[in-house]
Curated annotation (Swiss-Prot):
Expressed in the brush border membrane in the kidney (at protein level). Belongs to the amino acid-polyamine-organocation (APC) superfamily. One of its GO terms (biological process) is neutral amino acid transport. PANTHER family: AMINO ACID TRANSPORTER (PTHR11785), B(0,+)-TYPE AMINO ACID TRANSPORTER 1 (PTHR11785:SF354). This is b(0,+)-type amino acid transporter 1. Signal peptide: none annotated. The keyword Transmembrane helix applies. Residues 1-31, 85-110, 239-251, 326-351, 392-410, 451-487 are cytoplasmic. Residues 1-20 are annotated as: Disordered. It catalyses: L-leucine(out) + L-arginine(in) = L-leucine(in) + L-arginine(out); L-histidine(out) + L-arginine(in) = L-histidine(in) + L-arginine(out); L-arginine(in) + L-phenylalanine(out) = L-arginine(out) + L-phenylalanine(in); L-cysteine(out) + L-arginine(in) = L-cysteine(in) + L-arginine(out).
Length: 487
């Protein structure tokens, strides 16, 4: 059998080079520092450098703008603490997927994987790489817009590079993440220190009467939260690689408690720094807030800002790829995707098929280029699944009392997150109804067709098609099923 011969070949190679033989499964290569870097590196992408104006546009004053940024950080921390309980109770990779499976059964878990793998994850990956490409191209096309084909080709190259790095080695992917996280923290520190210097010099005009003209409508507040929480997106990413964390019972909660508050403090201080240099009107008119800040504060070294923003975006893309590949891997292992997507590289011990699949889908999303609106309308779906997952935590407090809980958050924390999730789901639909929200719901529910056709009933003709495809891909990529499932 093919997988047996592949395993035997690997064992022969290992016996020649080393006395230690690792099982063909995901290895625990991610420590506390790498875990913190994954959280910080995935959350801090391009958003805080480019579009803090979105929060200001909906609050219309400085004071509430800063409060929204702080509140979003607190909400992300509360949500992550709930995920810490889930992640130490159910130590499987895949983020929300195994938790929904355990709490509500296979159908909600499948709909989450269907929506995430086809739209949410790869389109976000594509957008981050397009943002990276635009910043790099801007350095070579000064004063004019770079050709769309150049931007798309460079974005595709970035996707190929990141996918290759993560398919080659878990340790290499972690190392790249650590390097880019360090690089983005440099520019964060430069902006914060510059802002504090200006603040100490008495540039506090924009903070006087900071609540004047505040927008108080429910719709505007919900949109401000949406934009703020978009910049915090990634707070749950460490739960996607729980099986690869060393000592997850300690490192998962510690990485969350250190990483997300660190990001929150950085975001608030960066916004304060922006307001020491720009008036609210100037900030709203800026195309890229951090670049405008750099032009005014760092000239003639203002080129540093777009360079480090590019580093920041590529780091966020790497973190997204690193974690999202594990969702595909776990979905394949549960039979909710092609089985070959759950296979492990014999030589590299990485989920190479899942990562390659993810990269291909992301490149497809680059072709149309304008996919921001798609992600905007699916962002409410993200909070639908966040809310369902944390509801599952509450449900399992009563239905699965047998599960060991190394971490147990007070019950009011998941209840708060569930209520906020419900507000974020319903508020934009009620305030500004749009057909796109209905299309999004219909797309999610369309996953039921594929579930019953290919997962529940497992028609023979589908098996006859998938079996030879799996066989040839397995031999081509030298991958085998994991030797054991996590417990």
């Amino acid at each position: 059998m093919e997988e047996t011969s592949l395993r035997r070949r690997r064992e022969d190679e290992k016996s020649t080079h080393s006395t230690e033989l690792k099982t063909t499964s995901l290895q625990k290569e991610v420590g506390l520092l790498s875990g913190i870097c994954i959280i910080v590196g995935t959350i801090i992408g391009s958003g805080i450098f480019i579009s803090p104006k979105s929060v200001l546009a909906n609050t219309e004053s400085v004071g509430p703008c800063l409060i929204i940024w702080a509140a979003c950080g607190i909400l992300a921390t509360l949500g992550a603490l709930c995920f810490a309980e889930l992640g130490t109770m159910i130590t499987k990779s895949g983020g929300e997927y195994p938790y929904l499976m355990e709490a509500f059964g296979p159908i909600p878990a499948y709909l989450f994987s269907w929506t995430s793998l086809i739209v949410m994850k790869p389109s976000s990956f594509a957008i981050i790489c397009l943002s990276f490409s635009e910043y790099v191209c801007a350095a070579f096309y000064s004063g004019c817009k770079p050709p769309a084909v150049v931007v798309k080709l460079l974005a595709a190259a970035a996707i190929l590079f990141i996918t290759t790095v993560n398919a080659l080695s878990v340790r290499l992917g972690s190392y790249v993440q650590n390097v880019f996280t360090a690089a983005k923290m440099v520019i964060v520190a430069i902006i914060i220190i510059s802002g504090l210097v200006f603040l100490a010099q008495g540039n506090v005009k924009n903070f006087q009467n900071s609540f004047e003209g505040t927008q108080t409508s429910v719709g505007a507040i919900s949109l401000a939260f949406y934009n703020g929480l978009w910049a915090y997106d990634g707070w749950n990413q460490l739960n996607y690689i729980t099986e690869e964390l060393r000592n997850p019972y300690r490192n998962l909660p510690m990485a969350i408690v250190i990483g997300i508050p660190l990001v929150t403090v950085c975001y608030i201080l960066m916004n304060i720094a922006y307001f020491t240099v720009m008036t609210p009107t100037e900030l709203l008119q800026s195309q890229a807030v951090a670049v405008t800040f750099g032009d005014r504060v760092l000239y003639p070294a203002s080129w540093v800002v777009p360079l480090f923003v590019a580093f920041s975006t590529i780091g966020a893309a790497n973190g997204t790829c690193f974690t999202a590949g594990r969702l595909i891997y776990v979905a394949g292992r549960e039979g909710h995707m092609l089985k070959v997507l759950s296979y492990i590289s014999v030589k590299r011990l990485t989920p190479a098929p899942a990562l390659i699949f993810y990269g291909i889908i992301a490149i497809i999303y680059i072709i149309p280029g304008d996919i921001n609106s798609l992600v905007n309308y699916f962002s409410f779906a993200a909070w639908l699944f966040y809310g369902m997952t944390i509801l599952g935590l509450v449900v399992m407090r009563f239905t699965r009392k047998d599960l060991e809980r190394p971490i147990k958050v007070p019950l009011f924390i998941p209840i708060i997150v569930i209520l906020v999730s419900l507000f974020l789901i319903l508020a934009p639909i009620i305030s500004e109804p749009a057909w796109e929200y209905l299309y999004c719901v219909l797309f999610i529910l369309s996953g039921l067709i594929f579930y019953f056709l290919f997962v529940y009933y497992k028609f023979g003709w589908a098996q006859r098609i998938s079996r030879p495809v799996t066989k040839h891909l397995q031999m081509l990529m030298e991958v085998v099923p994991p030797e054991k499932d996590p417990e």
